[in-house]
Amino acid sequence: MRFYIGLMAALMLTSILRTDSASVDQTGAEGGLALIERVIRQRDAADVKPVARTNEGPGRDPAPCCQHPIETCCRR
């Protein structure tokens, strides 16, 4: 009887491990693509050059504005 219980436990454990390893492979591939996309977005954001504001003058903040197409606010 103990042999059959041990055998069933071993079979259940192997099936669980196979399922986990398959899901790791799938998420690993998707995670790799997400990582590449994130690195490309960070690189593109780093390529943005700040430009001077056109409304510089007394009482104005001369900080450069960010001209990124996604961001509309100025960085300070």
From Swiss-Prot:
Q: How is it modified after translation?
A: Contains 2 disulfide bonds that can be either 'C1-C3, C2-C4' or 'C1-C4, C2-C3', since these disulfide connectivities have been observed for conotoxins with cysteine framework V (for examples, see AC P0DQQ7 and AC P81755). Five different peptides have been described after total venom examination by HPLC-MS. Cal5a is the longest. Cal5b-Cal5e are identical in length but are differentially hydroxylated. It is possible that hydroxylation and proteolysis at position 53 are incomplete in some of these peptides.
Q: Which UniProt keywords apply?
A: Disulfide bond, Hydroxylation, Ion channel impairing toxin, Neurotoxin, Secreted, Signal, Toxin
**Molecular-function GO terms, alphabetical:** ion channel regulator activity; toxin activity
Report where it is expressed, by tissue: Expressed by the venom duct.
Q: Which GO terms describe its cellular component?
A: extracellular region
Q: Which residues form the signal peptide?
A: 1-22
Report residue numbers covered by any propeptide.
23-42
Tell me which residues bear 4-hydroxyproline: 50, 58, 62, 64
Q: Where in the cell is it found?
A: Secreted
Miscellaneous note, as given in the UniProt record, is: Cal5a-cal5e are found in dissected venom (DV).
What the protein does comes down to:
Probable neurotoxin with unknown target. Possibly targets ion channels.
Q: What is known of its domains?
A: The cysteine framework is V (CC-CC).
Question: What is the official name of this protein in its record?
Answer: Conotoxin Cal5a L1
List the lineage, top down.
Answer: Eukaryota, Metazoa, Spiralia, Lophotrochozoa, Mollusca
